[in-house]
Amino acid sequence: MKNKSDDYVIRVLNSPQAIDAVQWNKLLALQEPASELNPFMRHEYLAAMQASGSAVPNTGWTPHFIALYNGTELVGVCALYLKSHSYGEYVFDWAWANAYQQHGLAYYPKALVASPFTPAPGPRLLAKDAATRVQLVKALMAWCDSEKLSSLHVLFGSDADIAACAEAGLMLRHTVQFHWKNVVPTLVAARTALPPEGAVLARGGPSLQTAAPTPVAARTAQPPTQTQFKDFEDFLGSLNQEKRKKIRQERRKVSEAGVVFRAIRGADMSSADWDFFYRCYERTYIEHGNAPYLSRNFFELMATQMPENWLMFVAEREDRPIACSLIALSSGEQNGQKTAYGRYWGALERVDCLHFEACYYQPLQWCIAHGFDSFEGGAQGEHKMARALLPVKTTSAHWLAHPSFADAVERFLAREEEGIAGYMEALERRNPFKPTAS
């Protein structure tokens, strides 16, 4: 499908392979923060989702990528999927779907702009500038309207994405994640790190002028004068006594069980390493009665096309691998933020506190040793606060075609935002760090 919007040609494509990878990644590199290339929006990552059979029509993800061209130049693009369910999204709208069904209306298929199965904040609407990003949102909404879809959802977007969605009249919704920063936070810094409350936007109108998206700097960012931790002991020394003692106890349990760890960068991972990881990854899903979202072939593609973006921790006991965690790493590490993302984990044997060691303590220790600025722990999990991951808000944007349901969801989001504000305040009182002067 082709049409025109202002000076741009809009193409709707059923595969990322139909878009030049060099142009895509060049556009991704322009997004904020410019010094950090988000791995989950790389062309290779999204192409692997489809090529591996992980995010395809048979699994409920039908690709319809929206691309804006100025001549032959790609100036805007997003990964749009028609969804026949709400699995693998981590922003829960099952209640909305049920309400539609109860009133005899179809909620699915819906339009979703996201990186499949990936609840990591970052750019979703890639554009050469703010004006083009607004045009991209308009193209999205026009396409949804032409296809008579129930709704459009932009998940875990960047500040620039959210601003463009707000300008177009989409409603904003917040969720809470837990992220770690490689600096000693002051109580004042931790408080100001919380994004502004009451930022639910009306669908158009003057209220858009008073609501602000969550700033990137607000994601527990720290003053630039602060330095990184010297080592893991330095990090532990910043925690209050209770949390410091608990972490040491948990690490001791794993060590006394005879478990040791190997950290392996992507380029050094063998096929056997990836096979073992997948056994662990698959086991986690099976234990919860589910099939894994991602196929073994997806990780094979990651191993060959994006090895620099992966880090594996293998737990061994008596020279046998027993558990594994896989961490994603941002690209563009030379001039700015370097971020690690906790992604997958699994174990073939049970050891007390092994999950905490594999998924938090080993990655944090590695981040400190390698000068990484932050570690994002993924969706949900307030137990992460005891491991020094602090709460931050993430933002998604939503448009519903049905006026009455849109009004109802808007009221729901306003109530939900009040609850999140109270939740954030309660979490702040559980700050695991020592009180320090600002």
Question: What does each model-identified segment do?
Answer:
Residues 1-203, 208-438:
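N-acyltransferase acceptor-side catalytic subdomain
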